[in-house]
Protein backbone atom coordinates (compact mmCIF):
# COMPACT_ATOMS: atom_id res chain seq x y z
CA UNK A 1 0.00 0.00 0.00
CA UNK A 2 1.34 3.45 -0.91
CA UNK A 3 1.18 6.41 1.43
CA UNK A 4 -1.30 8.05 -0.92
CA UNK A 5 -3.52 5.00 -0.76
CA UNK A 6 -3.35 5.07 3.04
CA UNK A 7 -4.61 8.65 3.03
CA UNK A 8 -7.37 7.79 0.56
CA UNK A 9 -8.49 4.80 2.64
CA UNK A 10 -8.80 6.85 5.85
CA UNK A 11 -9.91 10.29 4.66
CA UNK A 12 -13.57 9.63 5.54
CA UNK A 13 -12.62 9.15 9.18
CA UNK A 14 -9.79 11.69 9.53
CA UNK A 15 -8.84 15.05 8.13
CA UNK A 16 -6.76 14.81 4.95
CA UNK A 17 -4.36 17.48 6.15
CA UNK A 18 -3.61 15.52 9.33
CA UNK A 19 -3.22 12.23 7.45
CA UNK A 20 -0.78 13.82 5.01
CA UNK A 21 1.27 15.17 7.92
CA UNK A 22 1.38 11.70 9.50
CA UNK A 23 2.63 9.94 6.36
CA UNK A 24 4.80 12.93 5.32
CA UNK A 25 3.29 13.77 1.93
CA UNK A 26 2.12 17.09 0.56
CA UNK A 27 -1.63 17.56 0.23
CA UNK A 28 -1.17 18.82 -3.33
CA UNK A 29 0.67 15.62 -4.22
CA UNK A 30 -2.12 13.52 -2.72
CA UNK A 31 -4.81 15.35 -4.68
CA UNK A 32 -2.74 15.05 -7.87
CA UNK A 33 -2.48 11.31 -7.21
CA UNK A 34 -6.22 11.15 -6.59
CA UNK A 35 -6.99 12.98 -9.84
CA UNK A 36 -4.87 10.48 -11.75
CA UNK A 37 -6.81 7.49 -10.39
CA UNK A 38 -8.96 6.99 -13.54
CA UNK A 39 -5.85 6.92 -15.74
CA UNK A 40 -4.23 4.39 -13.39
CA UNK A 41 -7.32 2.22 -13.59
CA UNK A 42 -7.16 2.28 -17.38
CA UNK A 43 -3.46 1.30 -17.31
CA UNK A 44 -4.14 -1.47 -14.80
CA UNK A 45 -6.89 -2.87 -17.00
CA UNK A 46 -4.62 -2.72 -20.06
CA UNK A 47 -1.83 -4.44 -18.12
CA UNK A 48 -4.21 -7.19 -17.02
CA UNK A 49 -5.27 -7.80 -20.61
CA UNK A 50 -1.64 -7.81 -21.75
CA UNK A 51 -0.74 -10.23 -18.97
CA UNK A 52 -3.33 -12.68 -20.33
CA UNK A 53 -1.80 -12.44 -23.81
CA UNK A 54 1.70 -12.90 -22.42
CA UNK A 55 0.67 -15.97 -20.44
CA UNK A 56 -1.06 -17.49 -23.47
CA UNK A 57 2.12 -17.10 -25.54
CA UNK A 58 4.35 -18.37 -22.74
CA UNK A 59 2.13 -21.37 -22.07
CA UNK A 60 2.70 -22.72 -25.60
CA UNK A 61 6.07 -24.07 -24.47
CA UNK A 62 6.81 -22.42 -21.08
CA UNK A 63 10.24 -21.46 -22.39
CA UNK A 64 9.95 -18.05 -24.03
CA UNK A 65 11.46 -15.02 -22.37
CA UNK A 66 10.96 -11.28 -22.80
CA UNK A 67 12.50 -10.80 -26.29
CA UNK A 68 10.57 -13.55 -28.06
CA UNK A 69 7.30 -12.81 -26.27
CA UNK A 70 7.65 -9.13 -27.18
CA UNK A 71 8.27 -10.09 -30.81
CA UNK A 72 5.23 -12.37 -30.80
CA UNK A 73 3.03 -9.62 -29.38
CA UNK A 74 4.24 -7.10 -31.95
CA UNK A 75 4.14 -9.40 -34.97
CA UNK A 76 1.67 -7.83 -37.39
CA UNK A 77 0.52 -5.26 -34.84
CA UNK A 78 -0.34 -1.71 -35.80
CA UNK A 79 2.62 0.61 -35.01
CA UNK A 80 0.47 2.46 -32.48
CA UNK A 81 -0.31 -0.80 -30.67
CA UNK A 82 3.24 -2.13 -30.35
CA UNK A 83 4.39 -3.13 -26.88
CA UNK A 84 7.71 -2.07 -25.35
CA UNK A 85 9.95 -4.87 -24.08
CA UNK A 86 10.36 -3.09 -20.73
CA UNK A 87 6.62 -3.20 -20.16
CA UNK A 88 6.56 -6.90 -21.05
CA UNK A 89 9.41 -7.52 -18.61
CA UNK A 90 7.62 -5.63 -15.84
CA UNK A 91 4.38 -7.54 -16.29
CA UNK A 92 6.21 -10.86 -16.47
CA UNK A 93 7.91 -10.06 -13.17
CA UNK A 94 4.60 -9.11 -11.58
CA UNK A 95 2.91 -12.27 -12.86
CA UNK A 96 5.96 -14.44 -12.05
CA UNK A 97 6.29 -15.57 -15.67
CA UNK A 98 9.82 -16.49 -16.67
CA UNK A 99 11.69 -18.24 -19.44
CA UNK A 100 14.04 -21.12 -18.84
CA UNK A 101 17.72 -20.80 -17.97
CA UNK A 102 20.85 -22.63 -19.02
CA UNK A 103 22.19 -25.70 -17.24
CA UNK A 104 25.67 -27.15 -17.24
CA UNK A 105 26.40 -29.67 -19.99
CA UNK A 106 28.21 -33.00 -19.99
CA UNK A 107 31.34 -33.18 -22.09
CA UNK A 108 30.87 -35.29 -25.22
CA UNK A 109 33.91 -34.09 -27.20
CA UNK A 110 36.66 -36.69 -26.88
CA UNK A 111 39.55 -35.88 -29.24
CA UNK A 112 41.50 -38.70 -30.83
CA UNK A 113 45.13 -37.58 -31.33
CA UNK A 114 45.70 -40.40 -33.82
CA UNK A 115 43.16 -39.05 -36.31
CA UNK A 116 43.42 -36.19 -38.80
CA UNK A 117 43.05 -32.53 -37.91
CA UNK A 118 41.96 -29.70 -40.19
CA UNK A 119 42.29 -25.90 -39.94
CA UNK A 120 39.74 -23.52 -38.48
CA UNK A 121 38.22 -21.79 -41.51
CA UNK A 122 35.67 -19.76 -39.57
CA UNK A 123 37.65 -18.18 -36.73
CA UNK A 124 34.49 -17.95 -34.61
CA UNK A 125 32.69 -16.12 -37.42
CA UNK A 126 29.63 -18.32 -37.92
CA UNK A 127 27.80 -15.87 -40.16
CA UNK A 128 27.08 -16.39 -43.85
CA UNK A 129 25.72 -14.14 -46.59
CA UNK A 130 23.47 -16.84 -48.02
CA UNK A 131 21.95 -20.15 -46.89
CA UNK A 132 23.91 -23.34 -47.52
CA UNK A 133 27.36 -21.76 -47.21
CA UNK A 134 28.51 -22.35 -43.63
CA UNK A 135 27.36 -25.04 -41.24
CA UNK A 136 28.30 -25.91 -37.67
CA UNK A 137 27.65 -29.17 -35.88
CA UNK A 138 28.11 -30.96 -32.60
CA UNK A 139 27.05 -34.02 -30.62
CA UNK A 140 25.16 -33.60 -27.37
CA UNK A 141 23.91 -36.16 -24.88
CA UNK A 142 20.21 -36.54 -24.01
CA UNK A 143 19.87 -38.07 -20.51
CA UNK A 144 17.24 -40.75 -19.85
CA UNK A 145 15.89 -41.60 -16.39
CA UNK A 146 17.30 -45.15 -16.40
CA UNK A 147 20.83 -43.74 -16.47
CA UNK A 148 21.45 -44.18 -20.19
CA UNK A 149 21.82 -41.48 -22.81
CA UNK A 150 20.67 -40.85 -26.33
CA UNK A 151 22.91 -38.72 -28.53
CA UNK A 152 21.92 -35.96 -30.93
CA UNK A 153 24.10 -34.81 -33.83
CA UNK A 154 23.26 -31.47 -35.44
CA UNK A 155 24.02 -29.53 -38.63
CA UNK A 156 23.09 -25.84 -38.26
CA UNK A 157 23.15 -23.25 -41.04
CA UNK A 158 25.12 -20.15 -40.05
CA UNK A 159 22.99 -17.87 -42.22
CA UNK A 160 19.63 -18.49 -40.57
CA UNK A 161 20.51 -20.78 -37.62
CA UNK A 162 18.20 -23.32 -39.25
CA UNK A 163 18.69 -26.92 -38.15
CA UNK A 164 19.25 -28.30 -41.63
CA UNK A 165 20.08 -31.83 -40.53
CA UNK A 166 20.08 -33.93 -37.40
CA UNK A 167 20.22 -37.53 -36.22
CA UNK A 168 19.55 -39.22 -32.89
CA UNK A 169 20.80 -42.61 -31.70
CA UNK A 170 21.79 -44.67 -28.67
CA UNK A 171 25.46 -44.24 -29.59
CA UNK A 172 27.78 -41.46 -30.75
CA UNK A 173 29.75 -43.37 -33.33
CA UNK A 174 30.75 -41.78 -36.61
CA UNK A 175 27.59 -43.11 -38.27
CA UNK A 176 25.60 -40.63 -36.18
CA UNK A 177 27.26 -37.53 -37.62
CA UNK A 178 27.28 -39.02 -41.12
CA UNK A 179 23.50 -39.47 -40.85
CA UNK A 180 23.08 -35.86 -39.66
CA UNK A 181 25.12 -34.44 -42.55
CA UNK A 182 23.23 -36.64 -45.00
CA UNK A 183 19.97 -35.28 -43.60
CA UNK A 184 21.23 -31.74 -44.25
CA UNK A 185 22.09 -32.74 -47.82
CA UNK A 186 18.54 -34.06 -48.24
CA UNK A 187 17.15 -30.78 -46.89
CA UNK A 188 19.24 -28.57 -49.17
CA UNK A 189 19.42 -30.84 -52.20
CA UNK A 190 23.20 -30.40 -52.29
CA UNK A 191 25.94 -29.27 -49.91
CA UNK A 192 28.56 -28.81 -52.61
CA UNK A 193 30.86 -25.90 -51.77
CA UNK A 194 29.69 -25.58 -48.16
CA UNK A 195 31.93 -25.49 -45.09
CA UNK A 196 31.12 -27.71 -42.12
CA UNK A 197 32.67 -26.61 -38.82
CA UNK A 198 32.95 -28.80 -35.72
CA UNK A 199 35.10 -29.50 -32.70
CA UNK A 200 37.92 -32.07 -32.62
CA UNK A 201 35.79 -34.96 -31.40
CA UNK A 202 36.98 -38.36 -32.57
CA UNK A 203 33.90 -38.75 -34.76
CA UNK A 204 34.62 -35.54 -36.70
CA UNK A 205 38.32 -36.31 -37.17
CA UNK A 206 37.65 -39.84 -38.39
CA UNK A 207 38.61 -40.98 -41.86
CA UNK A 208 35.04 -42.15 -42.56
CA UNK A 209 33.57 -38.71 -41.91
CA UNK A 210 36.27 -36.99 -43.96
CA UNK A 211 35.48 -39.25 -46.90
CA UNK A 212 31.75 -38.54 -46.51
CA UNK A 213 32.41 -34.79 -46.54
CA UNK A 214 34.51 -35.09 -49.68
CA UNK A 215 31.80 -37.14 -51.37
CA UNK A 216 29.27 -34.38 -50.63
CA UNK A 217 31.61 -31.59 -51.72
CA UNK A 218 31.88 -30.28 -48.16
CA UNK A 219 35.05 -28.67 -46.75
CA UNK A 220 35.75 -29.44 -43.10
CA UNK A 221 36.73 -26.84 -40.52
CA UNK A 222 37.58 -27.42 -36.85
CA UNK A 223 38.11 -25.20 -33.83
CA UNK A 224 40.93 -25.50 -31.34
CA UNK A 225 41.10 -28.53 -29.08
CA UNK A 226 39.31 -27.93 -25.78
CA UNK A 227 37.98 -24.48 -26.73
CA UNK A 228 34.18 -24.50 -26.71
CA UNK A 229 34.00 -20.89 -27.93
CA UNK A 230 35.31 -22.05 -31.31
CA UNK A 231 32.02 -23.90 -31.77
CA UNK A 232 29.83 -21.58 -29.74
CA UNK A 233 26.88 -21.59 -32.13
CA UNK A 234 26.42 -25.36 -31.91
CA UNK A 235 27.02 -25.34 -28.15
CA UNK A 236 24.38 -22.64 -27.70
CA UNK A 237 21.86 -24.59 -29.77
CA UNK A 238 22.38 -27.72 -27.65
CA UNK A 239 21.96 -25.79 -24.42
CA UNK A 240 18.77 -24.14 -25.65
CA UNK A 241 17.27 -27.42 -26.80
CA UNK A 242 17.80 -29.13 -23.45
CA UNK A 243 16.72 -26.11 -21.45
CA UNK A 244 13.44 -25.81 -23.35
CA UNK A 245 12.63 -29.52 -23.50
CA UNK A 246 13.77 -30.74 -20.07
CA UNK A 247 12.38 -27.55 -18.46
CA UNK A 248 14.45 -27.83 -15.32
CA UNK A 249 14.33 -31.64 -15.17
CA UNK A 250 17.38 -33.87 -15.14
CA UNK A 251 16.30 -36.53 -17.64
CA UNK A 252 13.53 -37.74 -19.90
CA UNK A 253 11.44 -40.59 -18.42
CA UNK A 254 12.25 -42.96 -21.31
CA UNK A 255 13.78 -43.06 -24.79
CA UNK A 256 10.45 -42.81 -26.58
CA UNK A 257 9.53 -39.60 -24.78
CA UNK A 258 12.99 -38.19 -25.40
CA UNK A 259 12.81 -38.84 -29.14
CA UNK A 260 9.28 -37.47 -29.38
CA UNK A 261 10.01 -34.28 -27.46
CA UNK A 262 13.21 -33.59 -29.38
CA UNK A 263 11.41 -34.12 -32.69
CA UNK A 264 8.63 -31.74 -31.66
CA UNK A 265 11.09 -29.12 -30.48
CA UNK A 266 13.36 -29.14 -33.54
CA UNK A 267 10.31 -28.92 -35.80
CA UNK A 268 9.02 -25.95 -33.85
CA UNK A 269 12.52 -24.42 -33.72
CA UNK A 270 12.73 -24.29 -37.50
CA UNK A 271 9.15 -23.28 -38.24
CA UNK A 272 7.71 -21.33 -35.30
CA UNK A 273 10.26 -20.47 -32.61
CA UNK A 274 11.44 -16.88 -32.93
CA UNK A 275 15.21 -16.46 -33.10
CA UNK A 276 16.99 -13.27 -32.08
CA UNK A 277 19.54 -13.77 -34.87
CA UNK A 278 16.73 -13.74 -37.43
CA UNK A 279 15.18 -10.53 -36.15
CA UNK A 280 12.76 -12.54 -34.01
CA UNK A 281 11.60 -14.63 -36.98
CA UNK A 282 11.72 -18.44 -37.22
CA UNK A 283 14.74 -19.65 -39.24
CA UNK A 284 12.72 -20.98 -42.20
CA UNK A 285 10.65 -17.79 -42.38
CA UNK A 286 13.89 -15.80 -42.33
CA UNK A 287 15.23 -17.80 -45.27
CA UNK A 288 11.99 -17.47 -47.20
CA UNK A 289 11.86 -13.70 -46.76
CA UNK A 290 15.51 -13.42 -47.77
CA UNK A 291 14.79 -15.37 -50.96
CA UNK A 292 11.75 -13.19 -51.68
CA UNK A 293 13.84 -10.04 -51.23
CA UNK A 294 16.41 -11.33 -53.71
CA UNK A 295 13.68 -12.08 -56.24
CA UNK A 296 12.27 -8.57 -55.94
CA UNK A 297 15.73 -7.09 -56.38
CA UNK A 298 16.45 -9.18 -59.48
Question: What role is predicted for each listed range?
Answer:
Residues 1-298:
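Charged DNA-binding/catalytic regions of mobile-element recombinases
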Amino acid sequence: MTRFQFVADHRDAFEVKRLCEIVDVARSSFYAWLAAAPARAVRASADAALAQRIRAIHDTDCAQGVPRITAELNDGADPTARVNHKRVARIMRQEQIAGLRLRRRLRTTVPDPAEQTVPDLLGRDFTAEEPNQRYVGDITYLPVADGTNLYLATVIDGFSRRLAGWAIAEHMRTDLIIDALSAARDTRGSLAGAIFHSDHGAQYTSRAFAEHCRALGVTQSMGSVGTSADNALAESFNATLKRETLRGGHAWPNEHTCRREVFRWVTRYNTRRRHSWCGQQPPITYEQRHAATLQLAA
